[in-house]
C-alpha cells in the first residue's frame, strides 16, 4: 500500500504471523508482494514499498529458520514478470522466489526459469490457458511440463514441486482426487523422460 501507516501496520501483523509460524518449524514461507489492481502511475512506489516490507519480514523469517520466498503474481500485481520480481528482491540477500506456474501469463515457463535461475526456492504447480490463472491439474492446460522439468533440472533445482491445483479440468473442474494427482504427475515424468 502507499499509505505508510497502513503499510507498517500490515507488515507488523505479518511479522507477528511469521513468529507464530515458528510452532510449525516451516522450512519455507511464501509471501505475495502485493494485492491488486495496481495502476502504472503508482507501480514504482509500490515496488519500493514491497522491497522495504520484504526486507523487514526477512529478519523474522530468519529468526524462525525459514526460507522466505516471494511468489510471482498475475495481471496487474507486482512481480507479474520474472524481471520485476527480481527487481523487487535484488537488494535483499537470501530471499528466493516461489514460481507459481499458473501465474506467469506474460511469457513461457522456460523464460521464467532461465531469468530467475537459482533464486527459485519453491514451486506451486498448476496449469492454465496462458490467459488467466485457472489452477487446473498440471498437464490439463498449455504448459509444456517436460520442457519445464528440463529447465528446472538445468538450474539445479531440487526443491519442492507442490501441487496447487484446485480443479480437474478434464472432469468438469471438480476437485482433484489423489488418484488424479498421481496420474498427472506420472504424465509429467513420462513427458520429461521422453524429451531426453
Describe every region a protein language model picked out.
Residues 1-96, 106:
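Active-site acidic/histidine proton-transfer and metal-coordination neighborhood
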Residues 19, 27, 51, 55, ...:
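Histidine-acidic metal/acid-base catalytic patches
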Amino acid at each position: 500500500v502507499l499509505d505508510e501507516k497502513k503499510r507498517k501496520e500490515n507488515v507488523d501483523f505479518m511479522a507477528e504471523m511469521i513468529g507464530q509460524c515458528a510452532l510449525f518449524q516451516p522450512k519455507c514461507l511464501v509471501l505475495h508482494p502485493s494485492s491488486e489492481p495496481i495502476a502504472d502511475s503508482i507501480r514504482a512506489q509500490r515496488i519500493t514499498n514491497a522491497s522495504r516490507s520484504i526486507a523487514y519480514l526477512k529478519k523474522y523469517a530468519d529468526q524462525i529458520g525459514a526460507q522466505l520466498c516471494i511468489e510471482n503474481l498475475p495481471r496487474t500485481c507486482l512481480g507479474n514478470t520474472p524481471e520485476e520480481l527480481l527487481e523487487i528482491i535484488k537488494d535483499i540477500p537470501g530471499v528466493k522466489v516461489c514460481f507459481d506456474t499458473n501465474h506467469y501469463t506474460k511469457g513461457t515457463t522456460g523464460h521464467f526459469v532461465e531469468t530467475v535461475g537459482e533464486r527459485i526456492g519453491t514451486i506451486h504447480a498448476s496449469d492454465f490457458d496462458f490467459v488467466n490463472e485457472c489452477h487446473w491439474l498440471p498437464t490439463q492446460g498449455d504448459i509444456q511440463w517436460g520442457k519445464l522439468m528440463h529447465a528446472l533440472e538445468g538450474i539445479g533445482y531440487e526443491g519442492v514441486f507442490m501441487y496447487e491445483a484446485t480443479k480437474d479440468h478434464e472432469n468438469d473442474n471438480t476437485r482433484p482426487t489423489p488418484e488424479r494427482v498421481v496420474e498427472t504427475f506420472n504424465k509429467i515424468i513420462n513427458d520429461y523422460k521422453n524429451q531426453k
